[in-house]
Amino acid sequence: MPRALRRVPGSRVMLRVGVVVAVLALVAALANLAVPRPARAAGGGYWHTSGREILDANNVPVRIAGINWFGFETCNYVVHGLWSRDYRSMLDQIKSLGYNTIRLPYSDDILKPGTMPNSINFYQMNQDLQGLTSLQVMDKIVAYAGQIGLRIILDRHRPDCSGQSALWYTSSVSEATWISDLQALAQRYKGNPTVVGFDLHNEPHDPACWGCGDPSIDWRLAAERAGNAVLSVNPNLLIFVEGVQSYNGDSYWWGGNLQGAGQYPVVLNVPNRLVYSAHDYATSVYPQTWFSDPTFPNNMPGIWNKNWGYLFNQNIAPVWLGEFGTTLQSTTDQTWLKTLVQYLRPTAQYGADSFQWTFWSWNPDSGDTGGILKDDWQTVDTVKDGYLAPIKSSIFDPVGASASPSSQPSPSVSPSPSPSPSASRTPTPTPTPTASPTPTLTPTATPTPTASPTPSPTAASGARCTASYQVNSDWGNGFTVTVAVTNSGSVATKTWTVSWTFGGNQTITNSWNAAVTQNGQSVTARNMSYNNVIQPGQNTTFGFQASYTGSNAAPTVACAAS
């Protein structure tokens, strides 16, 4: 019994006072229960793991529910779509749809000094990106993402912009370069928890192995070397390690086979930093045999359990489905996605005690999956986005002023000899090849910016220019080009014009950083009001997107300046 309610002989006043005090205390307690206290928002600070969960700095469980926005890994050296939209509006839309994390693919090319993006429209958009290197553009994206409560996972997607590689090194990009570039980025964003971690290498596949012990092809050992190198720079980062293609003769999607991780786990020097990552796709990427199994889709949970789900189910480590996607055109793909979403565990039922995920992709220009955005880079595919609604999660707290990079990264290490897999390790072709989505561009019809009035160029004394024409991407019926205009004279230009004649039926559908007009096969590109002045020896670039059939030979370009 509470002290105030005990009977004190001859003290009825004390009893009444005690009763009043007790009643008031009870009312206050009930009032506190009646008014819900605001829940602590998840995602603050750097993250760590505990069993199969990811926790924030306050030990609040978080769920990565995100999207892939690619482009830094291509020869555009920047996220795609900035030829149509401002990067901030893109990030705002990602947040508005309920995605809280962006997997940001890149290649080691962007760490080479002076690498510049070549497909950004600066006309009434992206003006604060003008003149920035690719890395500096990445800084801007990371900073704004953090300000609005998004998080970033940096994904070493390719060694260079020419394409994916089975192993983490190639003849031109060594393991030493791979590791030093990871460390440089870790140093660059050190102190900024917007960048929560690194996906060390995208989709290792044959001849990459798991647990075979050969340092030239054992991806598990390479992941330990790279992961520990990153953690030596910033021990607070998460290390995301994908699987391989084959284990004990059992083939799966590239990067999706984690069957060996139970027996041969990745061991890092810093505990509670490891997240395993898998990729999974539907028939629009490749018609794997399990899609035609008569028990489909009931067979799929067992396949997922075997290859990567067991790591979560057995509380070994968190599992992040870093890529999964589909055009959603076939009923099989629709059934696959619905089944997979349930397997990943709906947030309303399981909260953050669930699989982590980032959908492939935000971009519409992924040829075998399409994207959440449609080809105009504005309209949302609400059907596809709707399939993901049950597994979306909350947006995180904004990151403060720490969004600036801590330092410039050191230049990439010059390639040094890397271990080469022996001929005996070359895999035997399997009856069912495993495809990986290679982004291909789809023409995007957006208005061409209007140029400010400029006089027709005349050959003024000392005003000269040259132009170079470079095809960035060609997917068989369309392509993108960057044209570099260089001042080859002795005085600054006031205006410039580049012209050429196509040899086929190429038709320009979109352009940026120049006023481009086409009359039949003849094309003229004139400067905008903001890039007319080029100092001697300096250059500016513009670009365009076009469609074609037949051949697509590069034309000869001419440049005139005044």
Curated annotation (Swiss-Prot):
Signal peptide: 1-41
Catalysed reaction equations from the record: Endohydrolysis of (1->4)-beta-D-glucosidic linkages in cellulose, lichenin and cereal beta-D-glucans
Thermal profile of function: Optimum temperature is 81 degrees Celsius. Thermostable.
Disulfide cross-links: 75-161, 209-212
CBM2 domain span: 458-562
Region (Disordered): 399-462
Alphabetical GO biological process terms: cellulose catabolic process
EC number annotated for this UniProt entry: 3.2.1.4
Function recorded in the entry: Has a very high specific activity on carboxymethylcellulose.
Name this protein carries in UniProt: Endoglucanase E1
Organism whose genome encodes this protein: Acidothermus cellulolyticus (strain ATCC 43068 / DSM 8971 / 11B)
